[in-house]
Amino acid sequence: MDLARNLKIDSVSRLNPTPPYQVGPGQSVAEAAALMREKKVGCLLVCRDGRVVGIFTERDLMRKVLAAGKPLTLPVADVMTPDPVQVHRKEPIGAVIRRMEEGGYRHLPVVDDAGRPVGVLSVKRIVHYLVEHYSPTICNQPPDPAIVPQAPEGA
């Protein structure tokens, strides 16, 4: 199949977004960081009454808390990114890639028809999807095509 065509017809659901791990706005940064570590994720959705009100990412933790010397007891609401851009699970992948690139986003909440969070889409999932569309010959090329490997990869 043609990548350009697939980017228009394949939806976000095809990317198998990660589960929407959540914290409440009043939970501490320490609690959020512990959950991120436990679940091995780069972000958490901050939800109130079943709706996304913010997103708390590794970047938020590093820049707004640790680098700023703020206490880990702060509520997540004080350092989260409020009202993040959200994508619908049926939205075409191509449109989502464009939004992520334009906004510089690495994670986006995925919502259903009722606006409830159903997942988180990461750049990593997008990269895996794109790699599926290239032959192994292209993916295994050396960074400099003039370099000829001395042995087959994995030998």
Task: Give a label for each model feature.
Residues 1-155:
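Tandem CBS (Cystathionine beta-synthase) repeat/Bateman regulatory domains
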